[in-house]
């Protein structure tokens, strides 16, 4: 089954009106691969501003959302709010949410379940730390994280999984294409064994972790890498080259 390449740009806590306008101008004027789906993860306060400036064919993602529709949850936003201002995606389970804000596998899975029920598409993040990789626990960790999602997600058609080795995020260290492919192949097999062969064949698995224009083409050649979740490079003009990595 052919899976449409999908590239997400996660701006994290970066950007202001001026820089967002510049990024939008770059993306609007660039010849982007029509066979690649592009999603921009923008800080919540700028989502509406970005939606008005970005090309309409680009998806827009919140970087977080809570597990209920409304209520006394100071500082949180809901999937319904994201949809209301024009976002169609949300990034959940990012390693920074797990490590800095203490989000558990169970909470992240509940967030994903609610976001999907509210009609958002979800980029569901997983990945191991350097300590876990060096201990040979990569497969064990990503399987545990996938199990948590699988307990709550029954329909996977609006889910993209993003594998992000935590040790490669923002460090300049990147998993080699072979290292990345090895984990993606394991995830594909895990999906086949634990969900279904159909989901395994159709679900897109992105790679995230210091993706740049320099390494994107080699990573994109791997059979089980279906796109990227890009951090810092998505704020730069080279993001266009990453989007076009399959060309």
UniProtKB/Swiss-Prot annotation:
Describe which pathway this protein belongs to, using the record's wording: Carbohydrate biosynthesis; gluconeogenesis; Carbohydrate degradation; glycolysis; D-glyceraldehyde 3-phosphate from glycerone phosphate: step 1/1
Quote the gene name from the UniProt entry.
Answer: Tpi
The active-site annotation reads 94 (electrophile), 164 (proton acceptor)
Asked if the Swiss-Prot or TrEMBL record annotates the protein with the keyword Heme, the reply is no
Give the residues the record marks as binding substrate. 10, 12
Alphabetical list of Pfam families matching this protein: TIM
Q: What is its EC number?
A: 5.3.1.1
Subunit structure, briefly? Homodimer.
Family as reported in the entry's similarity comment: Belongs to the triosephosphate isomerase family.
Report the GO molecular function annotations.
protein homodimerization activity; triose-phosphate isomerase activity
- List, alphabetically, the PROSITE patterns matched: TIM_1, TIM_2
Q: Which SUPFAM superfamilies match?
A: Triosephosphate isomerase (TIM)
Name a biological process GO annotation: nervous system process
Q: Which InterPro entries match?
A: Aldolase_TIM, TIM_sf, TrioseP_Isoase_bac/euk, Triosephosphate_isomerase, Triosephosphate_isomerase_AS
Protein's name in the database: Triosephosphate isomerase
Q: Name one GO cellular component term.
A: M band
Reaction catalysis annotation: D-glyceraldehyde 3-phosphate = dihydroxyacetone phosphate
Q: Which UniProt keywords apply?
A: Gluconeogenesis, Glycolysis, Isomerase
